[in-house]
């Protein structure tokens, strides 16, 4: 049996679970999609599919590099959603958090997720 780096498997599981959650709990994600984007439901479903596919593509070594780059591109594409979350007072539907959490997600968590993908591209 081939051994996979635990970090890569954790990342794959993270993105597959996050992607599936777009279908299980769309009410969580829909308020995070900026209102100025049309087709919020399509965006939510597409994001879920992309996250699941990229998460699965992290597992085989032959596709890991491209999956990592895809995740980085996806995370960059999600930046407007993070900015929008701050613009709407860090509220997504009925869930409201202190504004600093919205900024922390944008300035710290988001770059760390990009770095995580970058660090796993050749793992």
Language-model regions: role of each:
Residues 1-123:
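Membrane-interface extramembranous regions
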């Amino acid at each position: 049996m081939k051994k996979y780096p635990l970090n890569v498997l954790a990342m794959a599981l993270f993105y597959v679970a996050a992607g599936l959650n777009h279908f299980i709990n769309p009410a969580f994600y829909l308020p995070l999609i900026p209102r100025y984007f049309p087709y919020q439901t399509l965006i939510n479903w597409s994001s879920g599919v992309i996250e699941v596919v990229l998460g699965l593509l992290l597992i085989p070594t032959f596709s890991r590099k491209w999956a990592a780059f895809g995740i980085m591109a996806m995370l960059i594409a999600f930046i407007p959603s993070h900015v929008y979350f701050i613009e709407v007072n860090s509220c997504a539907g009925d869930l409201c958090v202190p504004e600093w959490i919205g900024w922390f997600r944008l300035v710290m968590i988001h770059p760390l997720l990009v770095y995580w993908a970058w660090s796993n591209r050749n793992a």
